[in-house]
A protein has these predicted regions:
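Short, surface-exposed beta-strand/strand-loop-strand elements in extracellular ectodomains
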Residues: 111-127
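Intrinsic-disorder/low-complexity, polar/charged segments enriched in Ser/Thr/Lys/Arg/Asp/Glu/Gln
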Residues: 70, 86-90, 98-102, 139-141, ...
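Noncatalytic modules at the cell exterior or secretory-pathway interfaces
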Residues: 100-104, 145-160
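Beta-rich globular "head" domains
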Residues: 93-111
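Surface-exposed loop/edge segments in extracytoplasmic proteins
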Residues: 71-73, 123-132
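Beta-sandwich interaction modules
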Residues: 91-93, 132-148
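N-terminal prepro-regions of secreted/extracellular proteins
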Residues: 1-92
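Edge beta-strands of jelly-roll/beta-sandwich modules across compartments, strongly enriched
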Residues: 112-116, 155-172
Length: 172
């Protein structure tokens, strides 16, 4: 009984030490300040797609097959009237060949809309939306064609009132 109590105390102490470290690491890794004031500072970039996005993709049989790959660009908690793009995370989409990009939008509530597409910065540093489509509703998705001439970045703007999750998928 005494051994179990001691083990429990040690385990509790270990957990209490780990939790602040994990929280600090998460804060360092996921909070970034952007230069542009209309960018969402609370958007989280996730390397792997979330379970929610995966569930959305499973309802798209033409996309989920052996040739489908998930881009390392997903955002969660994108606030209303704010946008993010892959440039912030160093994730450019430069296919080199013609490919179709699928964009999955998971709304936090019904009626959420989003503009998604591809963008690039020209030689003068001007931000140009290269190709765009609009998504609406829960678990909706659309396609965006890439232009291999430019170094494109995934672009997501929340045009609705609720937070949303968006993820890029491309098909070879």
């Amino acid at each position: 009984m005494r051994i179990k109590l001691k083990e429990g105390i040690i385990m509790a102490m270990a957990l209490s030490l780990c939790m602040p470290l994990h929280a600090a690491a998460a804060q360092r890794g996921y909070t970034e300040s952007f230069q542009e004031e209309n960018k969402d500072t609370e958007a989280i970039c996730i390397i792997d797609m979330t379970e929610k996005v995966y569930n959305s993709l499973t309802r798209m049989p033409s996309v989920v097959d052996g040739k489908t790959q998930v881009m390392a660009f997903s955002v969660e908690n994108l606030k209303s009237n704010s946008y993010v793009d892959g440039y912030d995370y160093g994730k450019s989409l430069n296919p080199g060949t013609r490919q179709t990009y699928y964009v999955v939008c998971t709304a936090r509530s019904s009626g959420t809309t989003a503009d998604v597409g591809l963008a690039y910065y020209n030689s003068q540093g001007k931000y140009i939306i290269n190709s765009k489509t609009s998504l609406s509703g829960y678990d909706s998705y659309g396609t965006v064609s890439a232009t291999p001439t430019f170094k494109n970045y995934g672009y997501v703007k929340n045009t609705g009132s609720a937070k949303l999750t968006a993820s890029y998928v491309y098909m070879k």
